[in-house]
Amino acid sequence: VLSGDDKSNLKTAWGKLGGHAGEYGAEALERMFVAYPTTKTYFPHFDVSHGSAQVKGHGKKVADALTTAVGHLDDLPGALSALSDLHAHKLRVDPVNFKLLSHCLLVTLANHLPADFTPAVHASLDKFLASVSTVLTSKYR
């Protein structure tokens, strides 16, 4: 459960991404593909090389979904319901992959926002991404 401090930390940190959210989403995907090559199996039709337009496009989708989630912290299940259905029923993504991408997002954000990535912000982002992952996997049962 996200506390009031977590919600404040998230809104402040996410606001500092500015117009870079899509870029950071793509970078996190690239990190995931390099660090966890088996994740590429969910993107057989993608050029997963560095700087690929497809990775950039999907990175923007990831960032947009997270931006939506940050805007609906009190109703993540409602805000992410369609995305949860998509990943559970159509794409059938192994739930562990959400944790892998979450880790890569944390690394990417820490790299780009070192002064803002305090232990409290790190903890809030980690809790948020875990909550998003839980919602995205909730319809697998």
Curated annotation (Swiss-Prot):
Q: Name one GO biological process term.
A: hydrogen peroxide catabolic process
| Residues reported to bind O2 | H58
Residues bearing the modification Phosphotyrosine: Y24
Entry keyword Acetylation: yes
Going by the entry's taxonomy, the superkingdom of the source organism is recorded as Eukaryota
The protein's GO terms of the molecular function aspect are: haptoglobin binding; heme binding; iron ion binding; organic acid binding; oxygen binding; oxygen carrier activity; peroxidase activity
Subunit structure, interactors included: Heterotetramer of two alpha chains and two beta chains.
What's this protein's function? Involved in oxygen transport from the lung to the various peripheral tissues.
Family indicated by similarity: Belongs to the globin family.
Question: What name does this protein carry?
Answer: Hemoglobin subunit alpha
